[in-house]
């Protein structure tokens, strides 16, 4: 029996309209009744996630910013990881050959250089939004991550440019097909979950996890039971071909699987 369940948000626990379904909320409550520790592991900001948990009266640990921060049930900071200032400076000041928009995150929020209303559709559930600033005036010593949002082919070309410029000084990953992230070296959800399990006196074998994108790869590959969403990025399936694939987030597939796991743990599972 797993003792901790870790959930990605976008494309996993959230439906395509970026809301949590009623079945999902009911299933999360059932997990808590079984004393299973809930953990939300997401690229979203801790300020947004704390607001969501408060609105839903959910007790959960938070892995946010794709592993840059880990917070306890009470909001205590358990782990932090920031980009080195020289890496942040290079990414912010370099002229990249890309049409993608750039977004900077630190403990105060989400910052970008111009209005992009379409991006806010993913935040209708919480009302969280960016702040418009001159990105070249950002403090460089406390940047948690930098994201580029745009067309996937354009981002793939940008990934090559970033890798050539940064080498091994940063971790690059796609948190969605349209979002490329620049993270501290060694920073990912799996590493953050390792920190959390050590804090809780658990092992990764005691954990189950669900995800759909390449920023979930390390987490899914390290836990005792990892599950890939039916709507997952093809690259994730190719990287972890041994893991089971469940249904689509639009059908609240995590809830569907967990209901079966709670009620019929000894019977085979079918996502249909």
Swiss-Prot record:
Catalyzed chemical reaction(s): 4-amino-2-methyl-5-(diphosphooxymethyl)pyrimidine + H2O = 4-amino-2-methyl-5-(phosphooxymethyl)pyrimidine + phosphate + H(+)
Active site: 8 (nucleophile)
InterPro entries with a match to the protein in the record: Cof, HAD-like_sf, HAD-SF_hydro_IIB, HAD_sf, HMP-PP_phosphatase
Enzymatic class: hydrolase
Protein keywords: Hydrolase, Magnesium, Metal-binding
Binding site for Mg(2+): 8, 10, 212
Entry keyword annotation includes Cell cycle: no
MF annotations from Gene Ontology: 4-amino-5-hydroxymethyl-2-methylpyrimidine diphosphatase activity; magnesium ion binding; phosphatase activity
Superkingdom of the organism of origin: Bacteria
Needed co-factor(s): Mg(2+)
Name of a matching Pfam family: Hydrolase_3
EC number(s) recorded for this UniProt protein: 3.6.1.-
Keyword hit for Hydrolase: yes
Family: Belongs to the HAD-like hydrolase superfamily. Cof family.
Protein function: Catalyzes the hydrolysis of 4-amino-2-methyl-5-hydroxymethylpyrimidine pyrophosphate (HMP-PP) to 4-amino-2-methyl-5-hydroxymethylpyrimidine phosphate (HMP-P).
Protein name: HMP-PP phosphatase
